[in-house]
Curated annotation (Swiss-Prot):
Belongs to the TPP enzyme family. MenD subfamily. Pathway: Quinol/quinone metabolism; 1,4-dihydroxy-2-naphthoate biosynthesis; 1,4-dihydroxy-2-naphthoate from chorismate: step 2/7; Quinol/quinone metabolism; menaquinone biosynthesis. This is 2-succinyl-5-enolpyruvyl-6-hydroxy-3-cyclohexene-1-carboxylate synthase. One of its GO terms (molecular function) is magnesium ion binding. Its EC number is 2.2.1.9. It comes from Escherichia coli (strain UTI89 / UPEC). The gene is menD. Homodimer. Catalyzes the thiamine diphosphate-dependent decarboxylation of 2-oxoglutarate and the subsequent addition of the resulting succinic semialdehyde-thiamine pyrophosphate anion to isochorismate to yield 2-succinyl-5-enolpyruvyl-6-hydroxy-3-cyclohexene-1-carboxylate (SEPHCHC). Transmembrane segments: none annotated. Its cofactor is Mg(2+); Mn(2+); thiamine diphosphate. Pfam families: TPP_enzyme_C, TPP_enzyme_M_2, TPP_enzyme_N. Keywords: Magnesium, Manganese, Menaquinone biosynthesis, Metal-binding, Thiamine pyrophosphate, Transferase. GO terms for biological process: menaquinone biosynthetic process. Binds 1 thiamine pyrophosphate per subunit.
Length: 556
């Protein structure tokens, strides 16, 4: 009997089972203990293979692939700290709903807690963050293949969102020629190998039902808050709110077109919040709200009813409103709850939104971070997509820009970390095949710098704009102690990215004005390669411009 051959047959069952649940993309890091999984994946023609040498980046690459494809994505890593590097992407997926299948190779039980190399306690290491965790036994023919495949099917068949951790111990030898070991064990699955259905098919969960009193509530004064959703859902939500005559407060990730732009500015005006107090119901569609003023209003508003509609399970309301938590696909929910044509009830807010946008436009000529955020809608590629980083840049775009309705926007706004942003953007581009504009800050780019290796392989033009404000300038917006702000919060690195781009053979530009930036973008969208654009700005201008606009709009 060949141990290495049976390891591979065991792994082949696991990988084939994944294909029955829509897994097409599989991300693989180098490693020896994961050899059975890697070779099984390589031999399965159903998979599109992605590789990366950094497991943390690999996890985020998978996250980006899952965001855009809307399908589960598998990841294969070796044992030890390689597994731990998947934690940030797993956490993000749990909060934003992407399906990640983590196949982590492991040492067999007799090598754990005895000083063996690269052997750590992997089962349960991700605590409650995976939706499902499976600790498989060492491969053995004493366990029927139908147990293995049905175990995988149960986890994936009941997976609505988030990650699945499948820990896979393998004993040595890991290498060797294939023989007939385990063939009869595999063949007991019969014609499953020629089928395309799961061995075990589980009925999907019930969706949220229609609210029977909707016909009553849609006649009231309502407010629509739009959080993270798909591009198609964004367009439908905008039309739905317009028909109802309800003001729509759209987040940067809502893709609604933000018909009342600059919400994070005008929500700081007492006239706006006073008018919103008249709302009898608030319907929030999608979660992960960005703007500080929006979050403050959301926490303080007291309508008769507060409904939150999102496909992700959980409470999703840090303000703990009295109301309803409705778990449903947003587009499906809108169909069940049609709008009735009514006249808009808000008068002040549309006027304030227009005045806020005019105040932003009046400042658009300076070459700075806030101005880039406002102008970003002018720089989007046709039939493309936008990936927005975290920290200051996403807040500036949320507050100062008006993105087109239905234009795809992606970001990691679950845990809102700055780790893995470039890797996630790479995954988003690969899954869509679309021209992609990604914008991040300098610290975010440094954090995931080796992901530039992933950006060498793109199928359409990708432009990465690194806004270099020399540190974490979001802390300029917070009451951090001035005496310690630079050393312990901003942490300026005084670096530029020309040599980093050169190391990975990526095109690089550092424009000095808007004309140079726009010329660079025109050229970049012509070729299916990556272009790194470093926009060096005055360190505090972005935060100061936002604060000045907030003060100005609050007194309108």
């Amino acid at each position: 009997m060949s141990v290495s051959a049976f390891n591979r047959r065991w792994a082949a069952v696991i990988l084939e089972a994944l294909t029955r649940h829509g897994v097409r993309h599989i991300c693989i890091a180098p490693g020896s203990r994961s050899t059975p999984l890697t070779l099984a994946a390589a031999e399965n023609s159903a998979f599109i293979h992605h590789t990366h040498f950094d497991e943390r980046g690999l996890g985020h690459l998978a996250l980006g692939l899952a965001k855009v494809s809307k399908q589960p994505v598998a990841v294969i890593v070796t044992s030890g700290t390689a597994v731990a590097n998947l934690y940030p992407a797993l956490i993000e997926a749990g909060l934003t709903g992407e399906k990640l299948i983590l196949l982590t190779a492991d040492r067999p039980p007799e090598l754990i807690d005895c000083g063996a190399n690269q052997a750590i306690r992997q089962p349960g290491m991700f605590a409650s963050h995976p939706t499902h965790s499976i600790s498989l036994p060492r491969p053995t023919q004493d366990i029927p293949a139908r147990w293995l495949v049905s175990t995988i099917d149960h986890a994936l068949g009941t997976l609505h969102a988030g990650g699945v951790h499948i820990n896979c111990p393998f004993a040595e030898p890991l290498y060797g020629e294939m023989d007939d070991t385990g063939i009869s064990w595999q063949q007991r699955l019969g014609d499953w190998w020629q089928d395309d259905k799961p061995w075990l098919r589980e009925a999907p969960r019930r969706e949220s039902e229609k609210q029977r009193d909707w016909f009553f509530w849609r006649q009231k004064r309502g407010v629509v808050v739009a959080g993270r959703m798909s591009a198609e859902e964004g367009k439908k939500v905008a039309l739905w709110a317009q028909t109802l005559g309800w003001p729509l407060i759209g987040d940067v990730l809502s893709q609604t077109g933000q018909p009342l732009p600059c919400a994070d500015l005008w929500l700081g005006n007492a006239k706006a919040t006073s008018e919103l107090q008249q709302a009898q119901i608030v319907v929030q569609l999608g979660s992960s709200l960005t703007g500080k003023r929006l979050l403050q209003w959301q926490a303080s508003c007291e309508p008769e009813e507060y409904w939150i509609v999102d496909d992700i399970e959980g409470r999703l309301d840090p303000a703990h409103h009295r109301g309803r938590r409705l778990i449903a696909n947003i587009a499906d929910w809108l169909e069940l709850h049609p709008a009735e044509k009514r006249q808009p009830w808000c008068v002040e807010i549309p006027r304030l939104a227009e005045q806020a946008m005019q105040a932003v436009i009046a400042r658009r000529d300076a070459f700075g971070e806030a101005q880039l955020a406002h102008r970003i809608s002018d720089y989007l590629p046709e039939q493309g997509q936008l990936f927005v980083g975290n920290s200051l840049v996403v807040r500036l775009i949320d507050a100062l820009s008006q993105l087109p309705a239905g234009y795809p926007v992606y970001s990691n706004r679950g845990a809102s970390g700055i780790d893995g942003l470039l890797s996630t953007a790479a995954g988003a581009q690969r899954a869509s095949g679309k021209p992609t504009l990604a914008i991040v800050g300098d610290l975010s780019a440094l954090y995931d710098l080796n992901a530039l290796a992933l950006l060498r392989q793109v199928s359409a033009p990708l432009v990465l704009i690194v806004v270099n404000n020399n540190g974490g300038q979001i802390f300029s917006l917070l009451p951090t102690p001035k005496s310690e702000r630079e050393r312990f919060y901003l942490m300026p690195q005084n670096v530029h990215f020309e040599h980093a781009a050169a190391m990975f053979e990526l095109k690089y530009h550092r424009p000095q004005n808007w004309q140079e930036l726009e010329t660079t973008l025109v050229d970049a969208w012509r070729t299916p390669t990556t272009t790194v654009i470093e926009m060096v700005v005055n360190d505090t201008d972005g935060a100061q411009t936002l604060q000045q606009l907030l003060a100005q709009v609050s007194h309108l």
